[in-house]
């Protein structure tokens, strides 16, 4: 019997990264300290055997014993300190916030049935909703536990500063994974998990379905080891995040899996971008995550029960296997779907799918929508406070060869002004508030391969309070800011644009001088002193209303491509209060060619004497810190 203290239940000699022997309070303690109790399993145990153990690094306590020893025994630990540990369904928010989150020690844990996260406690000190976080990680592991009914292995996620992003790895036979330390904060960030997800840790965690204890744990097309995890992680993104709720800003990286349109439009446009994952995930958007899980289960159940490999002479990781199992799970003819992905289907498999007599599945999606023929897969769509041009032709992922294409607004959009501009194109101006929405039903009709296709999609519009508007005044014919301000007085702008940051993004005016004016409100997450910075091409000015009237805060007089801590006028420090809205006006004068303007910030704390601009790490002000000027004071957008 051995007791180990530290970050996991392995000795240093068992670790794969054992070439660094130092540690500090800024990182995880190096591996574990093992304490041999000197007992042999052949000897009888006395209830009075007592041992003193301890460690300068603190951490969790683990018992290890020879697996040949099968008799039961009991161990009691005394004088164990309280630590920053969150136990699922045990640790309540009241106890967490009053005692546990500030408990001593530099190691913290989240424990749920099936997984465990271990990292430096500094990552968890600001967490408030411990119950949400433990519930999230239980749900995360439960997806694959349910989808794969064979032996699933409990997994520990370790976050260590020695591990680079490219070195994140899962050791399933050791029941643990290694992650970069900077991934840890995202695992306990409630807002981040909801709005951005956390692909890396989820991916490594889902390796627990594979390994020497799980024969046949790999499945999928050609890359079974990775496909397994990516499909499971995609289900998490669809079910438990609001990533798709921000698709009006575009979805980058892996985030496309959260939305039906974003998953399929590249394939329909002929792009060969991650086709294997997209071929699985689009099924969840059309038929539900339960159907996709049923498809996964069929790789374990139906595949072996019916001996499909012997019956059809196909391999489990072949495209023919996918097309066959997908047809069974969806009760649809998947031959058209597989043709979109350029998948080969063996002739006998193609005939088998045809003989099932299922209707053909056509994966066509509109970006505004959140349902497919009654299956609600998505999220509401954010629109700005002003007029939105709804172009259903441009925003629908559909077969380019489809004919007789029509888009019909069957019902809805009654809480705003809807004006038809041309066929399938409308201008929609909402007249509801930030805490309301407007719904619609869209019919998509077309002909593909001689077959009539009808798809009904529901959608919901919500206002995006964090999307600000700016006006563009063209041909101001001056390179002087004061003259430009005089020129645009009492004039109507040529057109308007929107931004989701405290900026006006890159644009090109050619040889023309133009003036851009953006209005909104600034909000900050924490009270204290903020140093604001400006960079602009070419000239910029910021007016901020802090004390009841607008005052000029920043002024860039010539092109400035990066934030400066030394040029007067390009930075200023102000004291701002949390949950207070500060109106602003941002001016950008472009003297021709490329143009942009952006505001950054550095939080300096609550003590004015500690303000030090030279030590600032400047960050761009993002969407969470700005509001549209039309947002009513105190209005709250619907919670996810």
Curated annotation (Swiss-Prot):
Signal peptide: none annotated. SMART domains: M60-like. Residues 463-615 form the PA14 domain. InterPro entries: PA14/GLEYA, Peptidase_M60_dom, TCAF. It comes from the Eukaryota. Residues 1-288 form the Peptidase M60 domain. Pfam families: Peptidase_M60. Coiled coil: none annotated. This is Antigenic protein NP1. It comes from Entamoeba histolytica. The lineage of its organism: Eukaryota, Amoebozoa, Evosea, Archamoebae, Mastigamoebida.
């Amino acid at each position: 019997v051995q007791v180990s203290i530290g970050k996991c239940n392995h000795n240093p000699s068992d670790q794969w990264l054992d070439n660094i022997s130092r540690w500090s309070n800024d990182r995880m303690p190096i591996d574990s300290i093992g304490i041999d109790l000197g007992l042999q399993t052949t000897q009888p145990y006395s209830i009075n055997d007592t041992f003193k153990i301890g460690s300068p690094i603190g951490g969790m306590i683990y018992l290890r014993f020879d697996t040949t020893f099968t008799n039961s025994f009991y161990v009691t630990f005394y004088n164990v300190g309280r630590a920053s540990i969150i136990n699922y369904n045990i640790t309540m928010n009241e106890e967490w916030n009053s005692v546990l989150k500030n408990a001593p020690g530099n190691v913290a844990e989240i424990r749920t049935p099936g997984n465990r996260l271990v990292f430096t406690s500094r990552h968890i000190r600001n967490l408030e909703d411990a119950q949400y976080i433990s519930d999230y990680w239980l749900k995360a592991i439960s997806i694959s536990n349910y989808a794969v009914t064979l032996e699933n292995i409990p997994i520990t996620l370790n976050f260590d500063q020695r591990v680079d992003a490219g070195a994140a790895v899962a050791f399933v036979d050791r029941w643990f994974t290694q992650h970069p330390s900077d991934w840890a904060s995202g695992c306990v960030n409630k807002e981040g998990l909801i709005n951005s997800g956390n692909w890396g840790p989820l991916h490594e965690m889902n390796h627990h379905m594979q390994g020497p204890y799980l024969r046949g744990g790999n499945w999928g097309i050609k890359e079974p080891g990775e496909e397994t995890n990516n499909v499971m992680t995609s289900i998490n993104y669809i079910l438990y995040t609001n990533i798709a709720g921000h698709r009006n800003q575009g979805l980058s990286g892996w985030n496309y899996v959260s939305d039906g349109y974003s998953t399929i439009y590249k394939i329909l446009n002929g792009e060969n971008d991650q086709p294997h994952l997209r071929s699985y995930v689009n099924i969840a958007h059309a038929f539900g995550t339960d159907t996709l899980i049923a498809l996964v289960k069929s790789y374990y159940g139906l595949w072996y029960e019916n001996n499909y490999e012997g019956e059809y002479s196909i391999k489990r990781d072949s495209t023919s296997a996918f097309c066959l199992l997908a047809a069974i799970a969806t009760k649809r003819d998947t031959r058209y779907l597989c043709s979109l992905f350029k998948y080969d289907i063996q002739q006998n498999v193609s005939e088998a799918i045809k003989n099932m007599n299922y209707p053909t599945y056509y994966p066509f999606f509109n970006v505004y929508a959140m349902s497919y023929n009654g299956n609600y897969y998505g999220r509401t769509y954010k629109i700005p406070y002003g007029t939105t041009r709804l172009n259903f032709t441009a925003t629908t992922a559909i077969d380019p060869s489809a004919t007789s294409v029509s888009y019909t607004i069957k019902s809805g959009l009654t809480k705003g002004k809807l004006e038809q501009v041309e066929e399938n194109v409308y201008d929609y101006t909402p007249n509801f508030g930030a805490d309301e929405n407007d719904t619609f039903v869209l019919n998509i009709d077309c002909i593909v391969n001689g077959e009539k296709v009808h798809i009904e999609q529901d959608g919901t519009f919500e206002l995006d309070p964090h999307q600000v508007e700016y006006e563009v005044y063209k041909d101001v014919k001056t390179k002087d800011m004061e003259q430009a301000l005089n020129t645009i007085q009492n004039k109507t702008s040529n057109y308007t644009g929107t931004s989701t940051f405290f900026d006006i993004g890159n644009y090109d005016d050619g040889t023309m001088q133009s003036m851009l004016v953006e209005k909104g409100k600034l909000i900050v997450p924490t009270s204290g002193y903020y140093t604001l910075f400006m960079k602009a091409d070419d000239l910029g000015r910021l007016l901020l209303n802090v004390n009841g009237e607008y005052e000029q805060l920043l002024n860039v007089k010539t092109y400035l491509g990066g934030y400066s801590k030394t040029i007067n006028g390009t930075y200023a420090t102000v004291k701002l209060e949390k949950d207070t809205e500060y109106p602003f006006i941002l001016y950008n004068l472009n003297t021709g060619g490329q143009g942009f303007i952006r505001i950054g910030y550095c939080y300096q704390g609550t003590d004015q004497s500690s303000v030090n601009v030279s030590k600032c790490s400047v960050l761009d002000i993002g969407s969470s810190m700005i509001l549209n000027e039309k947002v009513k004071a105190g209005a709250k957008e619907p919670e996810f």
